[in-house]
């Protein structure tokens, strides 16, 4: 319950940040009402369309059992073991190696992996990665992450539009109420995306450890996920998956993890920390299974 409250508070903070941007940029009650409207639309859109948005961002393509038999049967088998509806199965084109899950609940969920991950992971490691993603679905992390990504993306987009407007003739200041202050606008453009990113980090980091543990319980093989994470990190650094940074928290591995600045501003814990946690969990597995 504590984690749920924290997550709801952080999501509310993201929406509040979106409203604040509109207030400072447009000014007064007009800016406030527009901001509230934007926050409402963005949250509703991400709630009902989160799976479609994330899949579109990564250009994921739905596949059938005949098209990707090993992947499809792995998702099917683990879904039955976890006692959840089987999610949609998608493949992201490209040789980078990564995976993610999305959807507002287990009945409206999808699991996506890249072509690269299918080429480099042996069967037990692929199973561990799929189990990790299914745990995100079971824990409803997919909804939280998608809402956070959509709102953070809207904040970054709005801040970018404001910066363009500053270059081409200025904005705001037409409302006779408070708002449209040039310094406030400038600070908003610079600080809002950073604040949105920090809030996203607070939402997503602990969820990766929980999903790793869920994978270990579901497969009974935490070492397989540890090996997969190490393999994925090495490959992702060489061939990062290019997409909107707001949606990077959805991925199982962050390409820049392992570096100090990468860890500081990463939506994921370091791969080293995750591997250590999994190896500790391996010793406890007979007790927790």
UniProtKB/Swiss-Prot annotation:
Catalytic machinery residues: 133
Cofactor needs: Zn(2+)
GO biological process, one term: proteolysis
CDD domains: M48B_HtpX_like
Encoding gene per record: htpX
Transmembrane as UniProt keyword: yes
PROSITE patterns the UniProt entry points to: ZINC_PROTEASE
Matches recorded under PANTHER family: PROTEASE HTPX (PTHR43221), PROTEASE HTPX HOMOLOG (PTHR43221:SF2)
Ranges annotated as spanning the membrane: 8-28, 29-49, 151-171, 183-203
Disulfide bonds: none
A cellular-component GO term for this protein: plasma membrane
Alphabetically ordered keywords of this record: Cell inner membrane, Cell membrane, Hydrolase, Membrane, Metal-binding, Metalloprotease, Protease, Transmembrane, Transmembrane helix, Zinc
EC nos: 3.4.24.-
Major subcellular location class: membrane
UniProt-listed InterPro entries: HtpX_protease, Pept_M48_protease_HtpX, Peptidase_M48
Compartmental location: Cell inner membrane
Entry's Gene Ontology molecular function annotations: metalloendopeptidase activity; zinc ion binding
Protein name: Protease HtpX homolog
Pfam families attached to this UniProt entry: Peptidase_M48
Similarity annotation: Belongs to the peptidase M48B family.
Main enzyme class: hydrolase
């Amino acid at each position: 319950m504590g984690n749920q409250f924290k997550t709801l508070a952080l999501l509310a903070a993201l929406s509040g940040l979106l409203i604040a941007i509109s207030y400072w940029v447009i000014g007064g009650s007009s800016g406030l009402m527009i901001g509230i409207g934007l926050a409402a639309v963005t949250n509703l859109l991400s709630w009902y369309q989160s799976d479609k948005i994330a899949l579109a961002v990564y250009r994921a393509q739905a596949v059938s059992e005949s098209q990707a038999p090993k992947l499809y049967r792995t998702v099917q088998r683990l879904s039955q073991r976890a006692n959840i509806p089987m999610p949609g199965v998608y493949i992201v084109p490209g040789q980078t190696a990564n995976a993610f899950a999305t959807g507002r609940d287990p009945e409206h969920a999808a699991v996506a992996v890249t072509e690269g991950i299918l080429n480099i992971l042996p069967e037990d490691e692929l199973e561990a990665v799929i189990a990790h993603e299914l745990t995100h679905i079971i824990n409803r992390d997919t909804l939280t992450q998608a809402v956070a990504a959509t709102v953070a993306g809207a904040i970054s987009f709005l801040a970018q539009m404001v910066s363009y407007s500053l270059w081409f003739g200025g904005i705001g200041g037409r409302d006779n109420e408070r708002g449209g202050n040039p310094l406030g606008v400038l600070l908003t453009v610079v600080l809002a995306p950073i604040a949105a990113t920090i809030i996203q980090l607070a939402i997503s980091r602990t969820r990766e450890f929980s999903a790793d543990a869920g994978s270990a319980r579901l497969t009974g093989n935490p070492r397989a996920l540890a090996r997969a994470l190490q393999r994925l990190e090495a490959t992702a650094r060489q061939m990062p998956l290019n997409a909107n940074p707001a949606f990077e928290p959805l991925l199982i591995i962050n390409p820049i993890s392992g570096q100090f600045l990468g860890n500081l501003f990463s939506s994921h814990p370091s791969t080293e920390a995750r591997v250590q946690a999994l190896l500790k969990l391996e010793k406890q597995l007979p007790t927790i299974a």
